[in-house]
Regions:
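Short, Lys/Arg-enriched C-terminal cap helix and immediately downstream tail that follows
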Residues: 8, 44-45
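Short basic helix-loop element that most often maps to the first helix and adjoining turn
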Residues: 5-23
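Short, conserved catalytic or interaction motifs in soluble domains
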Residues: 12, 37, 56
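Absolute protein N-terminus
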Residues: 1-3
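DNA major-groove recognition helix of helix-turn-helix/homeodomain DNA-binding modules
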Residues: 45-60
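Recognition helix of helix-turn-helix/homeodomain-like DNA-binding domains
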Residues: 28-42
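Conserved hydrophobic/aromatic packing and binding residues within compact polymer-binding modules
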Residues: 7, 21-22, 32-35, 61
């Protein structure tokens, strides 16, 4: 499973829409969509922020 799929799975488990996650992380909905479809790769800092918004950590994610 790749990063985008794992992020999408976590987001769905938390009952969040892409827009809600984007608002919490101060990112665009389009960027969240691109990451989930593996069209964009988040930096480590952005990935860490996204995971914090999803109640997870890098250690748990990988």
């Amino acid at each position: 499973m790749n990063i985008g799929e794992k992020l999408k799975e976590l987001r769905i488990q938390r009952n969040l829409t892409q827009e809600e996650l984007a608002d919490r992380c101060e990112l665009s909905k389009g960027f969240i969509s691109q990451v989930e479809r593996d069209l964009a790769s988040p930096s480590i800092a952005t990935l860490t922020d996204m995971l914090e918004c999803l109640g997870s950590s890098l250690k748990e994610f990988f």
